């Protein structure tokens, strides 16, 4: 190989590496934007693996899980998919998918294809929740010191546990005047503020999209703090208007897709 050829090959390698890094960075930025934007649809789909799956040969399970990666790649331009292992921590499901898109139909199209994969045909869909991210209803009416406290950043570091709790309010809540609701949500918020550093939360509005009114999503590395948070929230007046809290409550651990598929391919 001539010196010019070696230089040319080196330049191509550098360009390819730079493009890959740029592409990964762009994908990460797009992901963060979609997860933080308002007007984004979130779908939580929980599944149990049927008994026939474990009767397959290991090679067949590996081939079946490989088809899942193809579906995720196919829909990558329209949806962001997060994966969670519930097996061993929840009787409700073995696997949870959290899907985000700017249109709910994109979540549906992904799930339809996912359930046609070699793994998907062995999954029983035990729960599906749909919600929409919206601006805060009550925070604009809170005192400035409360607003400032709500900006407390969550501690850095991995948060391996994920909890999903759907909530349905009673009719009295929706008939309540705005001032009273703001006051009760202020009490709710004050109870939650001490845990902002260790628990990351995301709220989805589900009215008309699901049987629930809200889907609450949490990530944490400190389950003791999470337990204390829920106990604190159960002691405020607003809790009296929760007709349904959980049922199901989904508890799992956060894992990349490859790790999840490896668990089911073993």
Regions found by a protein language model. Give the residues of each.
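Bacterial N-terminal signal peptides that target proteins for export
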Residues: 2-12
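A common structural junction motif
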Residues: 114-122, 234-242
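A cross-kingdom feature marking solvent-exposed beta-strand/loop segments within repeated
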Residues: 64-66, 78-96, 197-202, 212, ...
């Amino acid at each position: 190989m001539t010196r010019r050829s070696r230089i040319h090959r080196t330049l191509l390698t550098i360009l390819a590496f730079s493009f890959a890094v740029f592409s990964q960075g762009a994908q990460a930025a797009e992901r963060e934007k979609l997860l933080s934007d308002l007007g984004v649809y979130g779908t939580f789909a929980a599944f149990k693996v049927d008994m026939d799956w474990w009767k397959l040969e290991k090679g067949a399970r590996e081939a079946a899980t490989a088809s899942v990666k193809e579906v995720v790649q196919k829909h990558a331009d329209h949806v962001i998919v997060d994966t969670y292992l519930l097996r061993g921590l929840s009787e409700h499901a073995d696997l949870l998918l959290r899907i985000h898109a700017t249109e709910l139909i994109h979540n549906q199209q992904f799930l339809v294809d996912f359930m046609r994969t070699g793994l998907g045909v062995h999954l029983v869909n035990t729960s599906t929740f749909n919600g929409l991210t919206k601006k805060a209803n009550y925070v604009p009416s809170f005192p400035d010191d409360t607003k400032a406290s709500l900006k407390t950043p969550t501690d850095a570091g991995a948060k391996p546990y994920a909890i999903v709790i759907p909530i349905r309010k009673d009719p009295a809540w929706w008939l309540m005047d705005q001032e009273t609701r703001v006051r009760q949500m202020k009490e709710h918020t004050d109870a939650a503020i001490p845990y902002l550093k260790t628990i990351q939360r995301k709220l989805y509005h589900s009215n008309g999209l699901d049987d629930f009114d809200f889907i609450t999503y949490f990530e944490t590395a400190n389950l003791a703090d999470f337990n204390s948070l829920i106990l604190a929230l159960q002691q405020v007046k607003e809790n009296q208007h929760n007709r349904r809290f959980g049922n199901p409550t989904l508890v799992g651990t956060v894992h990349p897709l490859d790790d999840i598929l490896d668990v089911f391919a073993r």
